[in-house]
Regions:
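Glutamate identity and glutamate-enriched acidic tracts
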Residues: 1, 6, 10, 15, ...
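Terminal signal-anchor or tail-anchor transmembrane helices
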Residues: 1-36
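Phosphate-binding glycine-rich loops and adjacent basic patches that engage nucleotide phosphates
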Residues: 11-20, 81-92, 132-136, 194-203
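Active-site-proximal beta-alpha loop/turn segments in soluble metabolic enzymes
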Residues: 34-38, 218-220
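Glycine-rich N-terminal segment of FAD-binding domains in flavoprotein oxidoreductases
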Residues: 36-143, 149, 153-158
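FAD-binding subdomain of flavoenzyme oxidoreductases
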Residues: 149-221
Length: 221
């Protein structure tokens, strides 16, 4: 049987959401946005951040537990930052420094966006709209990261027209399990990995850079 407080909360859930939950969520969003802008990584330091990831992965590959089995690895992103239904315990594993990889590295003359995997859809969209471009596959989830969407299933409500997000990727930059940093394209020596990476969820390698096609933005919706 429900308590008086539970019955009251159930009867007034609309008021609780509008006047308490939404304002709290807005303040949390504002705090996270300011914190992210203040700690924005420099694009020029991309190679240094990748070297840190390579070193962490290589060190993990060279270590083992008491039974001789390789140690587990997880990213150092907080659980609340991940779009996942599972609550992962990262206290007993080696954490790889991927959290700092959220810089936009540039937009070339062909309209290809070069960025780190932690860049969100919202950040990429604002950057591109200022240059009259947009992602070919734009998702409605502003906080979703481009790297996560490309390595998982980045689907949008108009994917029947534009396809999935990973189908707009032209280049992947990976750190493999032995700590090597490789660039994957359809026309280079790692071409066999190109179509294996989508839906792999990081099981083949850790994504540290990505190049995605964009398209001119329309003046109307």
């Amino acid at each position: 049987e429900l308590s008086c407080i539970e019955r009251w909360a159930e009867a007034h859930r609309a008021e609780l959401v509008v006047f308490i939950v939404l304002p709290i969520s807005w303040w949390i969003w504002l705090f996270r946005t300011i914190k992210r802008k203040c700690s924005a990584p420099k694009a020029s330091a991309h190679a240094e951040r990748v070297r840190d990831v390579c070193a962490a992965v290589a060190a993990n590959a060279a270590s083992s537990d008491v039974s001789g089995a390789p140690l587990l690895m997880r990213t150092d992103r907080s659980v609340y930052e991940s779009l996942s239904t599972r609550n992962s315990d990262k206290t007993q594993v080696n954490q790889v420094p991927l959290r700092a990889l959220h810089a936009i590295l540039g937009l070339d003359d062909d309209g290809v966006l070069h960025c780190e995997p932690g860049v969100t859809v919202g950040e990429a969209t604002r950057f591109l709209l200022a240059r009259k471009r947009m992602l070919e596959c734009t998702l409605e989830m502003e906080d979703a990261t481009l790297g996560g969407l490309a390595m998982a299933q980045g689907m949008t409500t108009h994917s029947h027209v534009c396809g999935l997000l990973h189908e707009t990727v032209v280049e992947w930059e990976l750190v493999l399990g032995d700590g090597r940093n490789v660039t994957v394209r359809r026309d280079n020596e790692h071409a066999d990995l190109f179509d294996a990476l989508p839906l792999s969820h990081g099981s083949i390698g850790l994504l540290v850079g990505i190049k995605i096609r964009t398209t001119p933005s329309k003046p109307w919706v």
